[in-house]
Amino acid sequence: MNELLSKVNRLIRRTAQSLAACEASLQKLNAEKEKLAEKERLYDMQLRYLQSLLDMKELLGEVVFRQDIFYSLRKVAVIQQQIAEINLEKQKIAERRKILNKEIVQQQAQRKHWWLKGEKYDRLKKRIKKQLLNQMLYQDELEQEEKYNGRSQEN
């Protein structure tokens, strides 16, 4: 029985280690997800800024020189290129976030698995301890009965 108890204790330690590894992995994934969200917020701010620059570059019925038109067109092209690059980066972030969400779901399932195993082993340990206690009490009762019967026969 004690050997079984030591095996169960080993299993409990192993499940606790696996559970801790899952927790660490989840924390790492959530931290990465937070960084992605922060990057996306920064890109959104940049997009708003670039869009406002683009809006300011519109020629609204103004009389301008040809060189000013070309200068404005170059500026607009640069701004549009920057907007396209930021949108591409945002797409990459969205794809990475999808992957992270899948990994998080997998890790949560793994964590639940190890937590349930740990609970099962804890219940088993309690049951074994209870059986050991009952066995010891029964053994003690038998010894007491033998002592009592031994004294009775001597008298």
Residue ranges and their predicted role:
Residues 1-155:
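Charge-rich amphipathic alpha-helical interaction elements
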